[in-house]
Design a protein with these regions (language model features):
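A beta-strand edge to alpha-helix "cap/lid" segment located at domain peripheries
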Residues: 1-25, 29-31, 46-143
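Generic structural marker for isolated residues within well-ordered, non-membrane alpha-helices
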Residues: 34
């Protein structure tokens, strides 16, 4: 039996964020394959960050390369509170909360991600057969 699209999409979000934690920590990122995130993003991928800035796929991939091992040893990221908002065919819109812990500070973002099933991308086989098409993040107040 194959996994439902919602389950696969949630798994992709969790696994990619776990990868980012390892990628951004000192002494971890150099051992990891950047293809994990490069193959995860659709060629037309766009991120609307919590500050309202818009970045395309090339900008995000470049930024992630620049940040490799750039966070402290205590950097952590968690994703939670998943909700499938919409699904049609091979596409799904997910909401989730991303929490980051860095240098004693906690920040949270409400994220809405459009993902779709796609085995192949221009840069190779996508992890889990799911690719990111669009991501919108909004700051949440932390207490």
């Amino acid at each position: 039996m194959t996994e439902r699209l919602a389950d696969l999409a949630i798994r992709e979000v969790v696994e990619l964020h776990d990868f980012f934690c390892a990628w951004l920590r000192p002494h971890n990122g150099s051992q990891l394959d950047p293809g994990r995130f490069e193959r995860a993003f659709d060629p037309e991928f766009r991120l609307v960050g919590p500050d309202g800035g818009v970045r395309d796929r090339a900008a995000i991939v470049g930024w992630l390369h620049d940040l490799r091992e750039g966070r402290g040893d205590n950097f952590r990221m968690e994703v939670s509170d998943f909700r499938a908002v919409w699904q049609q065919g091979d596409a799904i819109l997910l909401e989730y909360v991303e929490t980051q812990y860095l240098q004693g500070k906690t920040t949270q973002r409400q994220s809405t991600a459009l993902l779709k099933q796609a085995a192949e991308t221009p840069v190779g086989t996508s992890p889990l057969g799911i690719i990111w098409v669009h991501l919108q993040e909004t700051w949440l107040q932390t207490v």
